[in-house]
Swiss-Prot record:
It comes from Shigella boydii serotype 18 (strain CDC 3083-94 / BS512). Required for the insertion and/or proper folding and/or complex formation of integral membrane proteins into the membrane. Involved in integration of membrane proteins that insert both dependently and independently of the Sec translocase complex, as well as at least some lipoproteins. Aids folding of multispanning membrane proteins. This is Membrane protein insertase YidC. Residues 30-50 have a biased composition (Low complexity). The chain crosses the membrane at residues 6-26, 350-370, 420-440, 458-478, 499-519. Coiled coil: none annotated. Its main location: membrane. GO terms for molecular function: membrane insertase activity. Belongs to the OXA1/ALB3/YidC family. Type 1 subfamily. Interacts with the Sec translocase complex via SecD. Specifically interacts with transmembrane segments of nascent integral membrane proteins during membrane integration.
Length: 548
């Protein structure tokens, strides 16, 4: 099997992968907002069951740290807006990226509170609590490492509920602490809940990548339990009222999108009910509700949870909750993508440029795979040397396919040639290529990361398509330099147009991935020449001899 036929095999595998990726995206299209007005069916016992209403009619307060800019509604204490000052909305933009939003076009909120029989967020006890705050704006001052935002509410029975947001410098994890003071004569039965709700359909101003099959990533809900470390839950599944309803001791619930996530992490010794819910009007929710605790008369009860609202930074997320870092979705090749990213990050700590880091890691990967590459070309050279014998065999045996197959296998065995030896190394390279693709699409560190010249964002496609064209040129040179025994006219035509086909495919791929492929091709050309010279010295003619 020669190099061009191997390239054809890899091309077919690659195209198959992209078709599968597009099919996964389109087979269950997201329901439109106007189509999701059916009656809401939710998990039994969930906060959504109890009808956590929209906040409304409260005062909006501002809470700012060096990395978070939150807007909290005093009606219920929900986070209705979250801006991330360290992450621009767009390249060269002065506007921060907005993760949580409350507008007529789009809803994405982090709700939380106290429910249960005596909880102030239980609709049976009246409207959601209207908390009192000392001021309208809280700002983390210079030299200050922690910012506390206390909110208090006293019900008609004189019971006092305090909800305190605790934010730390440089941290995207927000602790939410509750204190319940029982002023009555009967125990209070209280449960905590945390809920994330979001519009299923993105408005046009936020839908910037779903039309590009090469840049499509998962957007939806997810959860983790001790038994299931990481499970995704699609919005369209929630819209169909096929809802989650499980009990878990520990774990978390989350909503994910490319590079960013929100998550509620409950902190208690009991079990929690994890649920999803179709809230109607095109809004999906995922949340948790804790087991009720009793606060005795004259006593104070303390409960707490953590809200992650920010970028998917793996090491920081892992420190907040077990397996929260798995929300950095590297797909089914995570076991390759994760070590690749760790190596890339380590290289970046020295060179300071993600583009040059990709170039270096390409040399490392190709160096590690050099023995396989050498085996590939050696096997191809041996196969080429056998072609005259195989051709004579075909002429001698005619149409007796069984005899031809038997004698060919005997010939391969006698000459110690593996007919698949040229294909196997290429098959090994395919998972690495796909793992790098997942890594580039899932690592927030590479978002808006510049390289050089006109490449200002390695996670986005080349705006001028120069890199894909260069990639096609390198493929063309590899094809011309490689030996071929392809005689089938159709295969010859396919191979002729393969660089063009790949160039068109790569027009929409992240620049970092195209850069990897260009450097990989250049290294292949160098390795190819070195291996060919060694084979010629051994009498293995890997290429056509020039006619004198």
């Amino acid at each position: 099997m020669d190099s061009q036929r191997n390239l054809l095999v890899i091309a077919l595998l690659f195209v198959s992968f992209m078709i599968w990726q597009a099919w996964e995206q389109d087979k269950n299209p997201q329901p439109q907002a106007q189509q999701t007005t059916q009656t809401t069916t939710t998990a039994a016992g969930s906060a959504a069951d109890q009808g956590v209403p929209a906040s409304g009619q409260g005062k909006l307060i501002s809470v700012k740290t060096d990395v978070l800019d939150l807007t909290i509604n005093t009606r219920g204490g929900d986070v209705e807006q979250a801006l991330l000052p360290a992450y621009p909305k767009e390249l060269n933009s002065t506007q921060p990226f907005q993760l949580l939003e409350t507008s007529p076009q789009f809803i994405y909120q982090a709700q939380s509170g106290l429910t249960g029989r005596d909880g102030p967020d239980n609709p049976a006890n009246g409207p959601r609590p209207l908390y009192n705050v000392e001021k309208d704006a809280y700002v983390l001052a210079e030299g200050q490492n922690e910012l506390q935002v206390p909110m208090t509410y006293t019900d008609a029975a004189g019971n006092t509920f305090t909800k305190t947001f605790v934010l730390k410098r440089g941290d995207y994890a927000v602790n939410v602490n509750y204190n319940v003071q029982n002023a009555g004569e009967k125990p209070l039965e209280i449960s905590t809940f945390g809920q994330l709700k979001q519009s299923i359909t993105l408005p046009p101003h936020l839908d910037t990548g779903s039309s590009n099959f090469a840049l499509h990533t998962f957007r939806g809900a997810a959860y983790s339990t001790p038994d299931e470390k990481y499970e995704k839950y699609k919005f369209d599944t929630i819209a169909d009222n096929e809802n989650l309803n499980i009990s878990s001791k520990g774990g978390w619930v989350a909503m994910l999108q490319q590079y960013f996530a929100t998550a509620w992490i409950p902190h208690n010794d009991g079990t929690n009910n994890f649920y999803t819910a179709n809230l109607g009007n095109g809004i999906a929710a995922i949340g948790y509700k804790s087991q009720p605790v009793l606060v005795q008369p004259g006593q104070t009860g303390a409960m707490n949870s953590t809200l992650w609202v920010g970028p998917e930074i793996q090491d920081k997320m892992a420190a907040v909750a077990p397996h929260l870092d798995l929300t950095v979705d590297y797909g089914w090749l995570w076991f390759i993508s994760q070590p690749l990213f760790k190596l890339l990050k380590w290289i970046h700590s020295f060179v300071g440029n993600w583009g040059f880091s990709i170039i270096i890691i390409t040399f490392i990967v190709r160096g590690i795979m050099y023995p396989l590459t050498k085996t590939q070309y050696t096997s191809m050279a041996k196969m080429r040397m056998l072609q005259p014998k195989i051709q004579a065999m075909r002429e001698r045996l005619g149409d007796d396919k069984q005899r031809i197959s038997q004698e060919m296998m005997a010939l391969y065995k006698a000459e110690k040639v593996n007919p698949l030896g040229g294909c196997f190394p290429l098959l090994i390279q395919m998972p690495i290529f796909l793992a790098l693709y997942y890594m580039l699409m899932g690592s927030v560190e590479l978002r808006q990361a510049p390289f050089a010249l006109w490449i200002h964002d390695l996670s986005a496609q080349d705006p001028y398509y120069i890199l894909p064209i260069l990639m096609g040129v390198t493929m063309f040179f590899i094809q011309k330099m490689s030996p071929t025994t392809v005689t089938d006219p159709m295969q010859q035509k396919i191979m002729t147009f393969m660089p063009v086909i790949f160039t068109v495919f790569f027009l929409w791929f992240p620049s970092g991935l195209v850069l990897y492929y260009i450097v990989s091709n250049l290294v292949t050309i160098i390795q190819q020449q070195l291996i060919y010279r060694g084979l010629e010295k051994r009498g293995l003619h890997s290429r056509e001899k020039k006619k004198s």
